[in-house]
A protein has these predicted regions:
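Long amphipathic alpha-helical segments used for membrane anchoring, targeting, substrate engagement
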Residues: 2-19, 288-447
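Short, surface-exposed connector motifs at secondary-structure boundaries
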Residues: 127-132, 154-158, 184-186, 211-216, ...
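Residue-level signature of catalytic and energy-coupling elements of molecular machines
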Residues: 16, 42, 78, 108, ...
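Short, glycine/polar-rich helix-capping loops at beta-to-alpha or helix-loop-helix junctions
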Residues: 141-147, 228-231
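Conserved phosphate-handling catalytic cores of large alpha/beta enzymes
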Residues: 171-175, 179, 183, 195, ...
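Short, small-residue-enriched loops and turns at beta-alpha junctions
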Residues: 111, 139-141, 165-167, 192-196, ...
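Primarily NTPase-proximal linker/entry elements flanking Walker-type ATP/GTP-binding cores
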Residues: 9-136, 143-163, 170-190
Length: 447
């Protein structure tokens, strides 16, 4: 995510190293590099111009802290200004005091509108809401079917009247249905187009007038860069959108859309899509995103993901097993399942502080390692999982054959598990600190 931009910004910061004090000439030279990095990231020209002006003024002004080194001063200022550029603080969804809360999803075809209607509904379902998806795209072949498939996977009902009724009537009937059945959130999936046209916009304006939504969320493909800003501006002028969902952010190395949309439209980015799976959606935090761009990590989002995957009852049982030194490969398997539920490994690693942008682009992070580890453990008997010491050479061959792996991989797993048991024993013997054991109980690293 934004690896290219982050790498170039960090290279620009090198201009300020080994400087005793920042001069106007130093700042000017560094700002030239930062400006180039932003323009190459397809950030809107006006945004770049104003951003550079503010950062330059602050870098040579009285706001600079004398306790920081010049490079640190500039990074601090750039971090604060990137945060401000993207909205400053998180903009939450506007929940109606009288249910249902109606969210109207709009956007061009191919931006991921239908999928993200489902993702958003799924996210709020996990928070205890009762969402309903309403299929108002009667034009695109299989659009209704696509929404129904998404709904089935998430176990969220989909309201549809087929493709012969007008989208305005479907939207109105969908709201009535939600009121009758007690759904407290309604996500209206409207029709997209390959390009903006008057017919599309008039239909969307008619739906807006008919259902008076609490939110009009525009889904925008972050991969199209500057064009996404133009799309957002057009939709905002005609519909007065309330927020933006930036999709495909996991594949965007530049970041032009994220840095430009709020500034140009005045409307906040509320959510970001970070993958193809239906749980890969996150609330947008400008401060966290700025830190991630600059390689400072995003520990808070990492904690959010860990808490979402965290099972308190399971953790308590695990802590007890660690204390009693009865931790088995079945327990190890449960920990792997929790790790997988947190999401893509590369994305998780990129949130760690100190991992510079671009540092992971050449790293070969093999996601199949977890799957192979699970296969090895599943190929063991219950007794072998409870007492891995009994696994001799012939058993290893059988396990390797059953899991489609090699004896070496089986040996590696057993060695790693043995090392983990030794570490647990050390923690247990160190005064049996409850805090220490609890921290270990929450440890989700696979190896």
């Amino acid at each position: 995510m934004f690896e290219s931009l982050g790498e170039k910004l960090n290279n620009a910061f090198k201009k300020f190293r080994n400087k005793g004090k920042l001069t106007e000439a130093d700042v000017k030279a560094g700002m030239r590099e930062i400006k180039l990095a932003l323009l190459e990231a397809d950030v809107n020209f006006k945004v770049v111009r104003d951003f550079i002006k503010i950062v330059s003024e602050r870098a040579v002004g009285s706001e600079v802290l004398e306790s920081l080194l010049p490079a640190q001063q500039v990074v601090k200022i750039v971090n604060e200004e990137l945060t401000r550029l993207m909205g400053g603080t998180q903009s939450k969804l506007n929940i109606s005091p009288k249910p249902p809360t109606v969210i109207m999803m709009v956007g061009l075809q191919g931006a991921g509108k239908t999928t993200h209607a489902g993702k958003l509904a799924g996210m709020y379902k996990k928070q205890g809401k009762r969402p309903l998806l309403v299929a108002c795209d009667v034009y695109r072949p299989a659009a209704i079917k696509q929404l129904q498939i998404v709904g089935e996977k998430l176990e969220i009902p989909v309201f549809t009247l087929g493709d012969k009724i007008s989208p305005v009537e479907i939207a109105k009937e969908g709201i009535k249905h939600a009121n009758q059945k007690g759904y407290d959130m309604v996500f209206i999936d409207t029709a997209g187009r390959l390009q903006i046209d008057e017919v599309l916009m008039q239909e969307l304006q008619d739906i807006k007038a008919a259902v008076e939504p609490s939110e009009i969320l525009l889904t925008v493909d972050s991969m199209i860069g500057q064009e996404s800003v133009n799309v957002a501006e057009t939709f905002n002028n005609l519909l007065d959108i309330t927020g933006v969902i930036l999709t495909k952010l996991d594949g965007d190395t530049r970041g032009g859309a994220a840095l430009s949309i709020r500034y140009v439209t005045g409307k906040p980015i509320k959510f970001v899509g970070t993958g193809e799976k239906l749980d890969t959606i996150e609330p947008f935090h400008p401060d966290r995103m700025a830190s991630r761009i600059l390689g400072m990590g995003d520990v808070l989002t990492l904690i959010d993901k860990a808490q979402a995957a965290y099972d308190e009852k399971q953790a308590a049982e695990l802590e007890q097993k660690m204390r009693q030194q009865t931790f088995t490969l079945d327990d190890y398997l449960a920990q792997l399942a929790q790790l997988k539920s947190m999401g893509n490994l590369e994305q998780l690693m990129s949130m760690m502080p100190g991992v510079k942008p671009g540092a992971l682009k050449d790293a070969k992070i093999d996601e199949s390692v977890l799957a192979r580890t699970e296969a090895i453990i599943h190929s063991m008997t219950k007794k072998e999982r409870e007492k891995p010491d009994i696994i001799n050479a012939s058993r290893k061959k059988r396990i390797a054959a059953g899991s489609g792996t090699s004896v070496e991989e089986v040996n590696k797993l057993l060695k790693q598990f043995d090392q983990m048991l030794k570490m647990m024993k050390q923690f247990s013997n160190m005064g049996k600190s409850r805090k220490g054991m609890k921290m270990l109980g929450r440890m989700k690293m696979p190896f």
